[in-house]
Regions:
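Conserved HGGG/HGGXW glycine-rich cap/lid loop of the alpha/beta-hydrolase fold
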Residues: 1-39
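Catalytic nucleophile-loop/oxyanion-hole region of alpha/beta-hydrolase
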Residues: 40-52, 104-113
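Conserved acidic catalytic loop of the alpha/beta-hydrolase fold
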Residues: 49-68
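Short glycine-enriched nucleophile-adjacent loop
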Residues: 76-87, 93
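Accessory cap/linker subdomain of secreted extracellular hydrolases
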Residues: 140-177
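Conserved serine/cysteine hydrolase catalytic core
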Residues: 167-219
């Protein structure tokens, strides 16, 4: 089963290229609120634990005894959390672009650190936020991404999404950047991602998944 990034990133056809269809039964799905899943960009009942439960429901629905779990970026966070919850169901984990949704990772990417590497993109990203609110950009964006003002919500969603997509790869993919010009794609991605970040992944404490994986073989 393939677990996409974000949260809120959705599945793309290119993700199938990781697997040989003659050898693997490839299962991809859009997590809550994004891609083809509905309701669109919904934050209610949208937590890490809801997604873990969804993965298990899919496995049971497809009558699969056990499976390999593949995830990158946020997908690696979710895969690890699922494996901690259902260790006997996972034949193996394939994780890339490891991200554990720890406070230091969020702060480095959205508050300081990455800003020194991509200063031009950073200035565009923070342009909509008043200087008085820039000490906590995740909080400032969340306020606007959950606003009843649709225009404000969508403009902030695009800035958030383009910042991440233009800086998460050394060579940004033109198609990905173009996709985030779409209000629908950007809104789901930014709202859901920011929702998870401001709630610290809905984990019991910072670094929970890293501390809890000691029971998994190979960890």
């Amino acid at each position: 089963v393939f677990l996409h990034g974000g949260p809120g990133g959705g599945v793309e056809p290119i993700y199938r290229q990781y697997f040989n269809p003659e050898k693997y039964r490839i299962i991809l799905f859009d997590q809550r609120g994004c891609g083809k899943s509905t309701p669109h960009a919904e934050l209610k009942e949208n937590t890490t634990w809801d997604l873990v439960a969804d993965i298990e429901k899919i496995r049971l629905h497809l009558n699969i005894e056990n499976w390999i779990v593949f995830g990158g970026s946020w997908g690696s966070t979710l895969a690890l959390t699922y494996a901690i919850s259902y260790p006997r169901i996972c034949k193996a984990l394939i994780l890339r672009g490891i991200f554990l949704l720890r406070k230091l990772e969020i702060e480095w990417f959205y508050q300081y650190g990455a800003s020194n590497i991509f200063p031009d993109a950073w200035e565009k990203y923070i342009s909509v936020i008043p200087e008085s609110e820039r000490d906590n950009l995740v909080k400032a964006f969340y306020k606007r991404l959950t606003s009843s003002n649709k225009d404000e919500r969508l403009s902030c969603a695009k800035l958030w999404s383009i910042w991440e997509r233009s800086t998460s790869k050394l060579i940004p993919m033109d198609k990905s950047l173009h996709d985030f010009q779409s209000s629908k794609v950007a809104e789901a991605f930014a709202r859901i991602e920011c929702h998870y970040f401001i709630n610290e992944g809905f984990f019991e404490y910072d670094g929970w998944n890293h501390a809890s994986c000691t029971g998994l073989a190979g960890c």
